[in-house]
Amino acid sequence: MAGRPLPGGGGVCAAAYPNTSAGFPPHLQAGAMRRRFWGVFNCLCAGAFGALAAASAKLAFGREVNVGFCVLGIIMMATTNSLMWTFFSRGLSLSMSSAIASVTVTFSNILNSAFLGFVLYGECQEVLWWGGVFLILCGLTLIHRELPPPRKPLPHKQR
């Protein structure tokens, strides 16, 4: 890079990044794609840790639990809750928008809660529950989707 002169004013130009196509929009360039991947990954982890926190709370405050399990459950709940917020914060900073992050965390949390409920406690969700999950996720997606810009009327229809 020592042989190439920097552009005037210290700005960044396409010649500074020879492997990046100047024709790609910013959200499709390599750095943005990597950033988007890690944002989604952190949000998925946040949802999983949130589900683990709920499962730990159920373990800690169950009816027939001795003191050791109660203390272990509280420690696990605090730890997984802290991890959930850490990953969610990272996911927010790496995501393209907070809406994408919140939808991803909600999706991950609901599915992981269902899985952990089945594995740890033998809970089976009915079709009505899955229908509700589907409607919640559709609603979140509709609320947070990006609307296209309004169309300009054609010149002959502006009368």
From Swiss-Prot:
Q: Which domain of life is it from?
A: Eukaryota
Where does the protein end up? Membrane
Q: List the keywords (alphabetical).
A: Membrane, Transmembrane, Transmembrane helix
List residues traversing the bilayer.
37-57, 68-88, 100-120, 124-144
> Which membrane topology term applies here?
Multi-pass membrane protein
Chief localization: membrane
Q: List cellular component terms (GO).
A: membrane
User: InterPro entries of this UniProt entry?
Assistant: TMEM42 (IPR039632)
Identify this protein by name: Transmembrane protein 42
Its gene is TMEM42
